[in-house]
Amino acid sequence: MKVLVTGGMGYIGSHTCIQMIEAGMTPVILDNLYNSKSTVLERIEKVCGVKPTFIEADIRDKAALVEALKVHNIEAVIHFAGLKAVGESVEKPLEYYDNNVNGTLVLVDAMRETGVKSLVFSSSATVYGDPASVPITEDFPTSATNPYGRSKLMVEECLTDFQKANPDWSITLLRYFNPVGSHPTGELGEDPQGIPNNLMPFISQVAVGRREFLSVFGSDYPTKDGTGVRDYIHVMDLSDGHVAALEKVGSKAGLHIYNLGTGNGYSVLEMVKAFESACGKNVPYQLVERRPGDIAECWADPSKAMNELGWKASRTLEEMTGDTWRWQSNNPQGYPDA
């Protein structure tokens, strides 16, 4: 199966491309390299012996999308491309709506024009807003507490409407919880450009000496230790979830919605301690004010994905932290420049 992977040079996209190749699929990557580096391609080749086709283009460039879909005889699309920082989205809402919402509409329009009717969308647990309770099932009410989450929710609503109007399409919405970890070889990992917005790359950059200390946003949440609780999922498990979605429902007409999480919640301080165990170092941190748009706790009920896709997260907290440290210690400055 030939699959266009938008944002395939990014953190989750690159790991998913490896799992797709292992499953016998052919990923074709389209990415504008806004938050990634072209050297990712060499790492993918090093790990699995195959160098995917790479197209440098923006998802808002319809002509480039149409050409990619046609020339490569694409059968399905996995759509990762988008901006993804909660804090930045509060400062730059228009950029988030343009990239994430408008970009998706341009992509779907290009798919419609070329007759490609299978889409897997990289959504997020942020669409649940501040949930009334945990664990979270797929039928929970959706809302948003920040423009990033709202952009994901708007895309979900657009795709839901589009699938109703085009019932022969297969559209899958994968609501991720908090991806962490790296490829077990240490060849690929999370390499944010600039100051990390996510917990694990920040912790690992402190441990490797790139940053002085970790800022823990909020220590007065109604949780076990006052810090935010999240469902951290290994990026390799998440990647397997995309492959399972393509294999099980990618050619089945309908709207398919799945949580991809572990069903367990860990606090920020628990993650710091687990990382300290993995790297054998202290990770200095300071407690600071809450971030706007953050919530107290959030974890998944992943049973629907298990029942319908046969998918279950299996990698442990020790693997999440150990694999992250292997990546960061092997690549203290992240991916090299091309």
Predicted regions mapped to residue ranges:
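Short-chain dehydrogenase/reductase
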Residues: 97, 145-153, 189, 193-197, ...
